[in-house]
Amino acid sequence: MTKIAWQNTKHIVVLGLGKTGVSVLRYLQHKRQQDQKLAEVKIQVFDSRENPPGLEEAKQILGDAELINRHWELEDTLAADLIIASPGIDLREDPVVLARDADIPIVGDVELFAQESKLPIVAVTGSNGKSTVTRMVEFVAKQCGKNVAAAGNIGVPVLDLLLQEQHPDAVILELSSFQLESVSSLKLKAAALMNISADHMDRYCTLDEYVKAKQRIFTHAKTWILNRQQQDTWPHPVTGKLMTFGNDSHPKHFGLLSGNIDRVSGPVAVTFDGSVVLRADQLQLQGIHNLVNVQAALALCQAIDIDIEAAVRAVKEFKGLPHRCELVSDNEGVLWVNDSKATNIGATAAAVEGLRPMINGRLLLIAGGVGKGADFRELQSTLERVDILLTIGEDGPRIGQLFNGSRQVKSLQQAVELAASLVQTGDMVLLSPACASFDQFQNFEHRGDSFRHAVEALYVNSA
């Protein structure tokens, strides 16, 4: 899109409060203070929630008069010169679509940031792994002496970076498909698309529509970092410098070397340019899928001028993120792994495929929750690598019907207790739900914490 003509903007409509919406208000307040001509601009905020997150701060910035506690109508959007939408807002709604048809600019916070920032930026998107990769790049960069910031769908809201007195040396953005829908000016040193699996099918009509939203990350990217195992998700043509990663070997790009370690066959090392740069046993992360995440992270580090050898030294110390294949207990020879962040089929498939080769015993999977319109038949081949399946939540029965002998239980607590009665030395219990959590929990963190507490209680009570 063309650059926003702030001097011609008299009326701004903000759709949605929350963390993003409040950061937009802070940004607009700052612009008003910097440019007296903007002091008279009318700003209205719409949010249909009775008590949306950030309401009190929004009142302090804007006052009560222009905080409107209802859903926006066509007359609201058509009255604006500029519409700023939070990521959760469906841009296919009639009041938004008709405003766009009337040539009213519709942007998100990332587009506002892109139009103003002159910082070096790399970005990550994908159905799964993007948070781990973002934090991994941030960790490595800081270990190598760079002042960097992680922002976007993780860390601080992007617009807050523009308000800081000291700007970082570089920015690492995690971007969701929702955020990318309204981005068109983001210039990146490198962009990575980790993977695509069916997700948010309650928002997108087709998988192709979801893929196209993800591919927008490459619009102005110099280096394109892409997954060799998912070439059907690559944008065509590839117009940037190509760097690939994958779970196979490659003579020039990043890849995996297979072999045998501790009696388990499979990938044992990360390679680059035909040489081993990192052994699997040097990492503190669980699962083969994390060896793939490391490859993408190293490629992004190269784009912000971090030497590969220095990056490899640093990444060995990265401990991973909570609720992502997190080992919460190794007790009596049984491993309990919290992968509550697995809110879609692809994430659960990655966890099972990544962890299965690392155990000598049986794999017991706990799955279920809110499926968000997913077709769970895509999980069928993954479930063939599972020995015992316990299901929970609203869509648990839909997963359970794919597995002979599965058992549906009422709660996660009951699932943990039942799992404890079934496992033996050498087994792993994996919570990887393939579903959202909001039928029984506040969020995936709440679900993961509940799993951890239930597991801890098992061994406290047996001590």
UniProtKB/Swiss-Prot annotation:
Positions bound to ATP: G126, S127, N128, G129, K130, S131, T132
UniProt keyword Flavoprotein, yes or no: no
Statement: the UniProt record of this protein carries the keyword Ligase: yes
GO CC list: cytoplasm
Name of a matching Pfam family: Mur_ligase_M
GO biological process, one term: cell wall organization
Pathways involved: Cell wall biogenesis; peptidoglycan biosynthesis
Keywords assigned: ATP-binding, Cell cycle, Cell division, Cell shape, Cell wall biogenesis/degradation, Cytoplasm, Ligase, Nucleotide-binding, Peptidoglycan synthesis
Stated role: Cell wall formation. Catalyzes the addition of glutamate to the nucleotide precursor UDP-N-acetylmuramoyl-L-alanine (UMA).
UniProt record similarity statement: Belongs to the MurCDEF family.
Protein name: UDP-N-acetylmuramoylalanine--D-glutamate ligase
UniProt organism field: Idiomarina loihiensis (strain ATCC BAA-735 / DSM 15497 / L2-TR)
Record gene name: murD
